[in-house]
């Protein structure tokens, strides 16, 4: 199937981050092939990455490993932005305000305060009724479809091969030249032969994309029973993403009018400067399936076989849920580190 040394299955954000990580550690781009059923520019419920709101937020877990992934990603994204030609690639930094109806974890606050730009806690006077803690900082914002397309374009230009193919079994991508296969299939890990991870499940989200070029700040309100957010999309002719829902186990790719209205109601309460409901220009309503996993992300090296005395490996990197953009560079870094350590 391929003469490449490394095959990455999946062309979502995790797959592209993994390709970059391999190159960053000295792999020649021509030694990498990305094989995927869906490529940047495609639209499918099973191809999650284009549908994401796409920014760095405080949504992730408070365990040490997750915080490490966040920090690595936040502090290294500027390198990818520079490679892709600057903010116009679909990756820019904008202000963010996040408000919580419960106290924030102290370990997480200690971690993010060390590296988030322009970080500061909100004062009591700044917090609306019901909010007990909040922070402001400068965050990364993605125009997800544009960023994916430009990321792929860059990788292809320097020699990475992209191939459209639906893979039924992970072993099918091994040829004599392949040293390792990186499994970045996201929600596809539930059905991929040779993997079929029963711990993988969808977390459905619905968003509303609205034209509001005057909105240049992220805003979040995290409640115990709902999460509301407004995320500007850089270099998108003024689009913002309003959400959202986190529906575990829901495989539906349909959008629902009552959910749209609920999103808009909550979003306008959170961010009234967006405008009046009857004046909003709705560009799109979309649903996506976050690739979640019981037990969290799977980053693991699995011995596959031995050819001519050389061990070959499958490297799993999936289950990022809704954290792929903001944590995925750190996840890819750990996956490639683990592979090179195993292959010594």
Curated annotation (Swiss-Prot):
One Gene Ontology biological process: D-amino acid catabolic process
Short name of any one Pfam family annotated for the protein: DAO
UniProt keyword list: FAD, Flavoprotein, Oxidoreductase, Peroxisome
Description of the deletion phenotype: Unable to utilize D-alanine as a nitrogen source.
Residues binding anthranilate: 229, 290
Keyword Flavoprotein: yes
Top-level taxon in the UniProt lineage: Eukaryota
Cofactor: FAD
pH-activity dependence text: Optimum pH is 9.6.
EC number(s) from the headed UniProt entry: 1.4.3.3
TM stretches of this protein: none
Residue sites binding FAD per the record: 11, 14, 49, 53, 55, 167, 290, 321, 324-326
Catalytic activity: a D-alpha-amino acid + O2 + H2O = a 2-oxocarboxylate + H2O2 + NH4(+); D-alanine + O2 + H2O = pyruvate + H2O2 + NH4(+)
Binding site for (R)-lactate: 229, 290
Function: Catalyzes the oxidative deamination of D-amino acids with broad substrate specificity. Enables the organism to utilize D-amino acids as a source of nutrients. Enables the organism to utilize D-alanine as a source of nitrogen.
Family note: Belongs to the DAMOX/DASOX family.
Name of the featured protein: D-amino-acid oxidase
Organism field: Komagataella phaffii (strain GS115 / ATCC 20864) (Yeast)
Designated gene of the protein: DAO1
């Amino acid at each position: 199937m391929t003469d490449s040394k490394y095959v990455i299955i999946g062309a979502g954000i995790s797959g592209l981050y993994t390709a970059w990580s391999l190159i960053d550690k000295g792999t020649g781009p021509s030694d990498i092939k990305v094989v995927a059923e869906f490529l940047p520019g495609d639209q499918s419920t099973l191809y999650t990455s284009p549908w994401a709101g796409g920014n760095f937020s405080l949504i992730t877990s408070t365990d040490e490993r997750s915080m490490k992934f966040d920090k690595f990603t936040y502090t290294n994204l500027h390198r990818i932005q520079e490679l892709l030609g600057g903010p116009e690639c679909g990756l820019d930094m904008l202000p963010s305000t996040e408000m919580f109806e419960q106290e924030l974890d102290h370990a997480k606050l200690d971690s993010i305060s060390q590296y988030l730009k322009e970080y500061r806690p909100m004062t009591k006077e700044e917090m609306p009724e019901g909010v007990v803690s909040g922070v402001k900082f400068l965050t990364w914002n993605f125009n997800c479809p544009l960023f994916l397309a430009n990321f792929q374009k860059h990788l292809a230009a320097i020699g990475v091969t992209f191939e459209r193919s639906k893979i039924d079994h992970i072993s099918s991508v091994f040829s004599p030249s392949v040293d390792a296969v990186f499994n970045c299939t996201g929600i596809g890990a539930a059905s991929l032969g040779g993997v079929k991870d029963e711990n993988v499940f969808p977390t459905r989200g619905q968003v509303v994309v609205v034209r509001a070029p005057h909105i240049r700040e992220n805003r979040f309100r995290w409640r115990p029973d709902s999460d509301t957010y407004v995320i500007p999309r850089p270099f998108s002719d003024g689009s913002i993403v309003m959400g959202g829902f986190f529906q575990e186990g829901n495989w539906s790719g349909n959008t629902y009018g009552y959910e749209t209205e609920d999103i808009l109601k909550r979003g306008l309460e959170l961010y009234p400067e967006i405008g009046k409901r009857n004046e909003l220009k709705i560009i799109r309503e979309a649903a996506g399936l976050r690739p979640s996993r019981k037990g969290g992300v799977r980053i693991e090296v699995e011995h596959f076989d031995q050819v001519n005395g050389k061990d070959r490996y499958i490297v799993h990197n999936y289950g990022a849920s809704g954290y792929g953009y903001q944590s995925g560079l750190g996840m890819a870094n750990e996956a490639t580190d683990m592979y090179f350590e195993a292959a010594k």
